[in-house]
Swiss-Prot record:
It is an enzyme of class 1 (oxidoreductase). Keywords: Calcium, Heme, Hydrogen peroxide, Iron, Metal-binding, Oxidoreductase, Peroxidase. Its cofactor is Ca(2+); heme b. This is Peroxidase 5. It comes from Daucus carota. GO terms for molecular function: lactoperoxidase activity; metal ion binding. It comes from the Eukaryota.
Length: 17
C-alpha cells in the first residue's frame, strides 16, 4: 500500500495498522 486515498480517511487508518 503506497499511501492514503483521497476518497477515504478510513482507508488510510486501516492501511497503517
Amino acid at each position: 500500500y503506497l499511501g492514503p486515498t483521497a476518497d477515504s480517511t478510513m482507508d488510510q487508518t486501516f492501511a497503517n495498522n
